[in-house]
A protein has these predicted regions:
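Eukaryotic intrinsically disordered, low-complexity regulatory linkers and tails enriched in Ser/Thr/Pro
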Residues: 1-87, 92-95
Length: 95
């Protein structure tokens, strides 16, 4: 997955729909939370570590933003465990 170009992705149970900035769509057979876990580990922390850090820094425990790397900060639109959750890349939406 190209994290720097990822605009958003949607959890679809055991698959993930990924939308890139150039409007390309890709379907991955890997669940969204597993993709996030692998990306977080690649950039130095676990997914749970990123969630714990967000909660510690903000005092919030709901809809934790997931910092993957400087180009990818994902904001879930609802509970991360919900089957149809969208994860929006703050940096791509901002631009």
């Amino acid at each position: 997955m190209e994290w720097a170009d990822c605009l958003a992705f949607q959890n679809k149970g055991h698959t993930t729909i990924i939308i890139y900035e150039d409007n390309r769509m890709q379907e991955s057979q890997v669940p969204a939370l597993k993709l996030l876990q692998e990306a977080c580990l690649r950039f130095g922390s676990s997914l749970q570590g990123r969630i714990d850090s967000f909660c510690h820094l903000t005092g919030s425990r709901q809809k934790a933003c997931i910092y993957v790397n400087p180009a990818a900060l994902f904001i879930p639109n609802q509970s991360m465990k919900a089957e149809d959750t969208w994860f929006l890349n703050y940096h791509r939406i901002l631009n």
